[in-house]
Amino acid sequence: MIFRMTQNLRTGKLGEQMAAAYLEEAGYRILEQNYRCRFGEIDIIARDGDTIVFVEVKSRRSDKYGLPQLAVGPDKQMRISKISLFYLQTKRLDSYNARFDVVAVSLKPEGCRIELIKDAFELAYGR
């Protein structure tokens, strides 16, 4: 079990590194990686023009559990929304436009595939 957790952690970290490089190549400016606060963690916070972008990175080595981007369900969206509001307020960036993107990274033996889903979801309210 420890090996599996280590493998998952490695997959996640590699996916985040690849996503950050991909976003920079696409013109995003990375502001934070693995930002943590009392509400949780967000993988990447970046700037795309005048927009602050909160990016969730999902990485998979196989399709056994479905497409990576499908792992960002309502609970995860709620958590990311809370973190984003906290970040914008504490950094005094709440006058900026914000957006939620997902980067899906598929790491397979035949090669890597990175997909950027802009505006993947809206700000989630509730609970």
From Swiss-Prot:
InterPro entries: Restrct_endonuc-II-like, tRNA_endonuc-like_dom_sf, UPF0102_YraN-like. Transmembrane segments: none annotated. Gene3D superfamilies: 3.40.1350.10. One of its GO terms (molecular function) is nucleic acid binding. Disulfide bonds: none annotated. It comes from the Bacteria. Belongs to the UPF0102 family. HAMAP family: UPF0102. PANTHER family: UPF0102 PROTEIN YRAN. This is UPF0102 protein SYNAS_23220. It comes from Syntrophus aciditrophicus (strain SB). The lineage of its organism: Bacteria, Pseudomonadati, Thermodesulfobacteriota, Syntrophia, Syntrophales.
